[in-house]
Amino acid sequence: MLYDDMPALFPQHTPEKVRAAFVPDVIVGDLDSVRPEVLAFYGEMGTRCVDLSADQDTTDLHKAVTHMVDSAWRVQQGSGGSLDKEIAGKGWATEHRIFAAGALGGRFDHEMSNVSAAHEFVDTHVVLIGRHSMAFVVPANTSVAIVPDVEREGPSCGLVPMCGPAGSVRTSGLRWNLEGDSLEMGRLISTSNALDVGGTGGEVRIETDAPLLWTTDVSRLWNDEAP
């Protein structure tokens, strides 16, 4: 995604210039799906590769997020070691976000594993991005304000209860707002909704008693026509 698709965001520059401007500090995972020429390019640029193919119980995204949280934890606490999800959820720099490019689109089972990782690391604020959608988890028992970039996001959006029923959900800033409604897979879910933030100061507010996956259309981010 970084090597092949990042140049599409900057069509005014050559692909080589864009790739040289966005060099990862580390490549983490099984490394089985990375083309040799991509590894060679980033290796020459100083990127460190961490081969974790011995661990077949977690996905590449899970490994990458754990590595990032672990590194941040060492910097903040002066100690390191492997992190389980309890450590990852200890309020690591709540102003940070992890953007997982390429996490949506492609194989459905891969998408579901990435959604699962976003739920597991909900306190680490993992944002999943694909060519047409962006998604992140709204935690249970919270009231959150989201300020979408309406020039690049939407209008399509949705709220999906991926982890079980949500008994009461309230929203503002949507075309079809929820007023304490219950959301549940197999019954009512709020897909094919739309942003309508003109009367809410540019923000969407979501109040929920259960985790919800918030998603918006980002086709325009990639110079594609929104569906």
Q: Where in the sequence are the language-model features?
A:
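Structural recognition of alpha->loop->beta junctions
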Residues: 13-27, 121-125, 147-151, 156-167
